[in-house]
């Protein structure tokens, strides 16, 4: 499984839209999706909406980071939830992605309100200070994630057990 992270700028979104229209994210033999791109929204634009709608139309999945790094995003979480909630058929094709930061619980609660469970989500635990936050989340909300993206260091593989979900090493 390959989970590339994009910053959600206009040209990246346009490229993703073209690639999904050509079915480049599916494996040729069985139609299984081997690549799930993850977008960290910078702005809430019509290009982002069109990109998500293209994935839905092609029945392909796309990950959206619901708590983007504040220095990247020029909007607040309320705007993102309103924006995403307005798109039809999001649950089958839009995978929520969460950075394991101090606000994860508020973000996850809002995701729960719109019908997502922990098993639907991908956790991003890329920095060592995020490991205890991920462990706390697992303790408060038992069950595994769809995937857990982890940093390259051995600290991640040692501290994050398999029960949390399939680990995917994130290389920058």
Predicted segments with their positions:
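Non-catalytic accessory regions used for complex assembly or targeting
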Residues: 1, 27-29, 90-97, 104-107, ...
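N-terminal basic/disordered segments at the start of proteins
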Residues: 1-30, 42-45
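Short acidic, S/G/P-rich loop/turn micro-motifs used as interaction or catalytic elements
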Residues: 10-11, 41-46, 68-74, 101-107, ...
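A short acidic, amphipathic alpha-helical/loop segment
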Residues: 18-19, 47-54, 108-112, 133-137
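Flexible, charged surface loops at secondary-structure boundaries
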Residues: 20-32, 55-57, 88-93, 113-118, ...
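Conserved, mostly hydrophobic/aromatic
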Residues: 37
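A broadly used, surface-exposed interaction patch
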Residues: 53-117
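Long, charge-rich C-terminal accessory regions
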Residues: 133-172
